[in-house]
Amino acid sequence: MFDKQEFVSKLVTEEKAKIVLLVMDGLGDIPVNGKTPLQAANTPNLDNLAKESDLGQTIPVLPGITPGSGPGHLSLFGYDPIKYQIGRGILEALGIGVEVGEKDVVARANFATWDGKVVLDRRAGRPATEESAKVVQLLSEKIKKIEDVEITFYPGKEHRFVVKFTGEGLGDKVTDADPQKEGHPMAWAEGLDEPSKKTARIVNELIKKIAEVLKDNSKINFALIRGFSKYPDLPKFPQVYKMKAGAIATYPMYRGLAKLVGMEIIETGQTVADEIKTLKEKWNDYDFFYVHVKKTDSYGEDGKFEEKVKVIEEVDAIIPEIVSLNPDVLVITGDHSTPVPLKAHSWHPVPLLIWSKYTRRGLSQAFNEFECARGTLGTIHASDVMTLALAYAGRLEKFGA
């Protein structure tokens, strides 16, 4: 079978160049009262950049398929998200420094609110990270083993945490123990093969034990567990693209994804301004920078239009600082769309901007979904973004005579 990434890798040259991939998570949207958040936001810097850039839109997986953040990012990094299907658990686990061995299955978990019949809130009101950490500590003290499987809990950000299952004969082909929507009955884990049936049984028993431990907490009284995974084997980004790559991200899952493909994790603060400060400080240390902004996605999922607008404006304000570093290529896009009216990821194409000195500038006047839809790049697969970035950086040889 044709491997596009392997094909591109053979054309990559040793030339030096600086590439920045700025991912605004869940960026794409649909109009509310005639405008998307990108259209409603005051973005003079992004709009000026658009006038000097090639614009287009990406399909992360296939037309009509709604991607998770994992497939969306893998695709942007140049990997086939269908060939490399990775559970979210391993990404979250690696992002917070969890060691994952051969006997381990890891999963991502959310604290939730449950009334005994339906899941009322899949994120338990988004508790503060410190509050969640205390609950994780309580669970660690109360639940250590189920059958012959050791259970280890690790706190994450806000409502998120990681569970590691360690034991013999565990599989990771397990359906999510999560109804995915609020107001729905619980969807319990199911194993799709014999080893995974054991994992599913342990998972469902664990959730019941968690509910028992937390029964007196009106808000944080349940858990949803999903993204079961063992440690996968992927081609490493630095070897494929011949670049030293650094990742600047505040959320564990995205650090985990970057680590999984071989990027170095650069420590940073919690704000967009912190991330750009880190980018400037580490500018001479890497050839490729992946910079991740989470809140565009969070506010899309919460249905908060104005808040999503404000995050876009916050990013717009730091664009001159990135441009002042004079990267050879600046790519601005999202990993998927998260429309405010849907309060969820969607299948809609994702806005894409590529800025370099080699663009066919002059067509576009602003950066938004509709300008991108008519842009010079057209509609492309997200896994082609890295190929384009390398081309705009002068890092690809000619193919053929």
Curated annotation (Swiss-Prot):
Known EC number:
5.4.2.12
What CDD domains has UniProt attached to this entry?
Answer: iPGM_like (cd16011)
Q: Which superkingdom heads the taxonomic lineage of this protein's source? A: Bacteria
State the Gene Ontology terms under molecular function.
Answer: metal ion binding; phosphoglycerate mutase activity
Keyword Isomerase attributed = yes
Q: Could you provide one GO biological process annotation from this protein's UniProt record?
A: glycolytic process
Q: Which reaction does it catalyse?
A: (2R)-2-phosphoglycerate = (2R)-3-phosphoglycerate
Give UniProt keywords alphabetically. Answer: Glycolysis, Isomerase
User: Which top-level enzyme class is recorded in the Swiss-Prot or TrEMBL entry?
Assistant: isomerase
Task: Output the Gene3D superfamilies linked to this UniProt entry.
Answer: Alkaline Phosphatase, subunit A (3.40.720.10)
InterPro entries per the UniProt record, alphabetical: Alkaline_phosphatase_core_sf, ApgAM_prokaryotes, Metalloenzyme, Pglycerate_mutase_ApgM
Q: In which pathway does it act?
A: Carbohydrate degradation; glycolysis; pyruvate from D-glyceraldehyde 3-phosphate: step 3/5
Has keyword Acetylation? no
Q: Which family does it belong to?
A: Belongs to the BPG-independent phosphoglycerate mutase family. A-PGAM subfamily.
Q: Which PANTHER family does this entry report, sorted A to Z? A: COFACTOR-INDEPENDENT PHOSPHOGLYCERATE MUTASE, METALLOENZYME DOMAIN-CONTAINING PROTEIN
The entry's function note states: Catalyzes the interconversion of 2-phosphoglycerate and 3-phosphoglycerate.
HAMAP family referenced in this protein's UniProt entry, alphabetically = ApgM_B (MF_01402_B)
Name of this protein? Probable 2,3-bisphosphoglycerate-independent phosphoglycerate mutase
Q: Which organism is it from?
A: Thermotoga sp. (strain RQ2)
Q: Which gene encodes it?
A: apgM
